[in-house]
Amino acid sequence: MKYTSYILAFQLCIVLGSLGCYCQDPYVKEAENLKKYFNAGDPDVADNGTLFLDILRNWKEESDRKIMQSQIVSFYFKLFKSFKDDQRIQKSVETIKEDINVKFFNSNKKKRDDFEKLTNYSVTDLNVQRKAVHELIQVMAELSPAAKIGKRKRSQTFRGRRASQ
């Protein structure tokens, strides 16, 4: 009886192991296609270190990582945009973009559209420059953690007074 359970456990491991090969995320296959297309597997690609991986390893806190990830995702969207006319890799690019949509934007189309809108602004466009400078003070106020804490304390104080009356 003991040997039977070992044999069944072994068979289960083999079945689950073989299923792992077929249950890969779709982006992996498409990323491999892009690597072949761009000869990104060649040894010279590793010269001078990584672009993104070391940066991601340096940041452990979730909010810090999200900031870095947003810049990296922005880079990839710009990169993919430059490939839009190349039909040989279009399927791979679209599959990867869709997977980014699921993983990074939680399938939230509005969030993705706003993100793409931000990454598509041209810093050389005079109207964009003028609007950005016009909004700078408000944007800086939104970035300040002190402003957010002050707002929260005021609203909590107000609620406390109302409850005691």
Curated annotation (Swiss-Prot):
Tissues where this protein is expressed: Released primarily from activated T lymphocytes.
Gene3D superfamilies with a match to the protein in the record: 1.20.1250.10
Coiled coil: none
One record GO biological process: positive regulation of interleukin-23 production
Localization (cell): Secreted
Record key words, sorted: Antiviral defense, Cytokine, Glycoprotein, Growth regulation, Pyrrolidone carboxylic acid, Secreted, Signal
Transmembrane segments: none
Positions of glycan attachment: N48, N120
Cleaved signal peptide residues: 1-23
Modified residues (Pyrrolidone carboxylic acid): Q24
GO (cellular component) term, any one: extracellular space
Primary residence: secreted
Pfam family for this entry, one: IFN-gamma
InterPro entries xref list: 4_helix_cytokine-like_core, Interferon_gamma
GO MF term set: cytokine activity; type II interferon receptor binding
Function of the molecule: Type II interferon produced by immune cells such as T-cells and NK cells that plays crucial roles in antimicrobial, antiviral, and antitumor responses by activating effector immune cells and enhancing antigen presentation. Primarily signals through the JAK-STAT pathway after interaction with its receptor IFNGR1 to affect gene regulation. Upon IFNG binding, IFNGR1 intracellular domain opens out to allow association of downstream signaling components JAK2, JAK1 and STAT1, leading to STAT1 activation, nuclear translocation and transcription of IFNG-regulated genes.
Family: Belongs to the type II (or gamma) interferon family.
Complex formation: Homodimer. Interacts with IFNGR1 (via extracellular domain); this interaction promotes IFNGR1 dimerization.
Protein name as catalogued: Interferon gamma
